[in-house]
């Protein structure tokens, strides 16, 4: 599952090497593709996935992968326990719950970027610099879907920044792989939060890496990491 307000087709281009090793399915969140309905909630997205998997694959998947908000959505899917998933890779998961104020600020930033054709507002570059982040640490912005409606953007961001861990994930038998970079404070905080509930997980933190850095800058190695992880999971 792709990241927050991102174009699923751009994610597919990065992940194409996986098509050679696995039978892959690329869901797209509502509000993030041409002709789609507006985004409503993570629960609504999960229900659509559950209906598809139940109707086409008997309610079972060998594995799921999600990056950033996609990882958060996958955690909700696992917590609902309506389909069986053997393994889940959650990369850069976001469960920090910064609140509505952060959603409102992000909405204004995204709106300005949409109006400017995806260019970073000057004040955002300053904030990133103060945080020690360069533009290459924000690779996910290059994959955003800039035709999302204002309603989808606002609702999606509010869901993202107010979501909390669903305690139902404690009942999941899925083997969970938590991945993030060493320069991702919110993802690492999210790891600490979700590990309180998981009964079967492995954690990998890549030193010196920012949000999405492995996927966007070291794509070939990242693809190999996914393949090795999922093939190893089959042997468990």
PLM feature segments, named:
Residues 1-34:
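Conserved HGGG/HGGXW glycine-rich cap/lid loop of the alpha/beta-hydrolase fold
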Residues 79-80, 85-116:
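Flexible "cap/lid" loop of the alpha/beta hydrolase fold
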Residues 25-63:
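Active-site loop/oxyanion-hole signature of alpha/beta-hydrolase fold enzymes
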Residues 99-101, 117-170:
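Conserved alpha/beta-hydrolase catalytic His-Asp/Glu region
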Residues 209-221:
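Catalytic histidine-centered segment of alpha/beta-hydrolase-like enzymes
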């Amino acid at each position: 599952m792709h990241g927050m307000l991102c174009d699923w087709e751009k994610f597919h281009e990065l992940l194409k090497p996986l098509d050679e090793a696995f039978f892959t399915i690329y869901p797209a969140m509502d509000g993030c593709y041409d002709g789609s309905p507006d985004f409503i909630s993570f629960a609504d997205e999960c229900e659509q996935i559950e209906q598809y998997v139940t109707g086409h694959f008997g309610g079972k998947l060998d594995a799921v992968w999600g990056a950033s908000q996609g990882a958060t959505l996958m955690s909700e899917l696992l917590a609902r326990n309506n389909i069986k998933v053997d393994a889940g890779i959650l990369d850069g998961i976001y469960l920090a719950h910064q609140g509505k104020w952060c959603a409102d600020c992000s909405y204004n930033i995204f709106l300005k970027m949409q109006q400017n054709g995806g260019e970073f507002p000057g004040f955002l570059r300053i904030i990133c610099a103060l945080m020690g982040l360069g533009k290459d640490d924000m690779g996910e912005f290059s994959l955003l879907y800039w035709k999302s409606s204002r309603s989808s953007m606002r609702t999606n961001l509010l869901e993202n920044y107010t979501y909390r861990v669903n305690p139902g994930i404690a009942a999941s038998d899925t083997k969970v792989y938590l991945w993030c970079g060493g320069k991702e404070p919110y993802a690492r905080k999210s790891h600490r939060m979700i590990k309180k509930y998981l009964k079967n997980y492995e954690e990998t933190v890549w030193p010196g890496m920012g949000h999405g850095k492995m996927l966007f800058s070291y794509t070939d190695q990242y693809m190999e990491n996914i393949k090795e992880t999922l093939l190893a999971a089959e042997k468990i």
